[in-house]
Amino acid sequence: MEVLSEQQLFFMRKAVALGEKGRIFAPPNPWVGCVIVKNGCVIGEGWHQGIGSPHAEVCAVQDQKCSLEGAEVFVTLEPCCHFGRTPPCVDLLIKSKVAAVYVGLLDPDPRVCKKGVARLQAAGIPVYVGVGSQEAKTSLQPYLYQRERGLPWVVMKTAASLDGQTADRGGSSQWISGELARADVGKLRAESQAIIVGARTVCLDNPRLSARFPHGDLYERQPLRVVVDSRGTVPLESRVFDLSSGSTLFATTQQCPKEYIQKLKDLGVEVWESSSHQVDLKGLLRYLAERGCLQVLVEGGAQLHSAFWQQKLVNAGVIYWGPKFLGDQGQPMLRDLQLSLVTAEHVRITETSLVRDSVKTCFECLEQESVDKKG
């Protein structure tokens, strides 16, 4: 629908900002925000803080500062109308006798889609869908994509020197970007439900793949660490197999020795096996989506990044440009794609910012392979 007023857009943007507060803990649920307004003043606000906890609308109602009768509700995603871990939000809004509900986006979840709106309308409450829809879509893109495609939103993350190299000639890629950039990566990891890396990256850098605050403390919720290794070449003493600070999934093939797999299982590592001679990346993504992953972060290296690009599985990316030059003996960001200017992947730059001594570039892919849940 057409935006009715700048004031309504303002309140929806506020709801989107509130929803973002739940981005780390809400998944596999969407990070929804809600604002309740009466006589032009905010009388209640809330956001979904995690699975099993009250939804945004309930939190906003509980935050009320006066009677909700005649109030307007601004919510980023269509209110739910089914019993899950919590009761339907529409019933509470109807009981509260609100005057109108403004919805940023319809929920693609078939249990909710258009049903929540219909329930409210059947109760005589006007519902306006589409206010601030672009802002809501930008915020909830991983959730929307996962529900519509059956695949998580894939973000390619890498750090590169100013001449585009992601590792030195020996293959080491640690500390290309600055300290604040690495802190920013910690937040990006925390906002993702899984981090995917290749065997070479683990062998060369031995990363922990943990999500940390700038001062070094771990985020309370850690992403699943996923190691892609077709043959079982990663040393068993690698940090990613230390489960004291997070879980690890080992994605492999039938070429991996059974003894190696058993040792991983003895360590508590989950093993996902592909029947082909290479790890089925799309099948792996589908499995992660079934586990509730809305966004996954692919951290490389170049071989794994290239495989995701070749299969058109990348949705967006973040590049941290460090203040270094590594020369033509370094490792490229992507390899063996054999693209020309005509066949090159097109992206839209969504952000360029300075993170102290590094430059952060964010992009979204414009050309995506058409996929469905059976694809």
UniProtKB/Swiss-Prot annotation:
Matching InterPro entries: APOBEC/CMP_deaminase_Zn-bd, CMP_dCMP_dom, Cytidine_deaminase-like, DHFR-like_dom_sf, Eubact_RibD, RibD_C, RibDG_C, Riboflavin_Biosynth_HTPR
Top-rank taxon: Bacteria
Annotated family: In the N-terminal section; belongs to the cytidine and deoxycytidylate deaminase family. In the C-terminal section; belongs to the HTP reductase family.
Residues given in the record as substrate binding sites: 173, 189, 209, 212, 299
Free-text cofactor note: Binds 1 zinc ion.
Residue ranges of the region described as Deaminase: 1-150
All copies of domain CMP/dCMP-type deaminase, residue ranges: 6-127
Keyword ATP-binding: no
GO MF, one annotated term: NADP binding
Pfam family, one: dCMP_cyt_deam_1
Protein name: Riboflavin biosynthesis protein RibD
Active site: 57
Upper lineage: Bacteria, Pseudomonadati, Chlamydiota, Chlamydiia, Chlamydiales
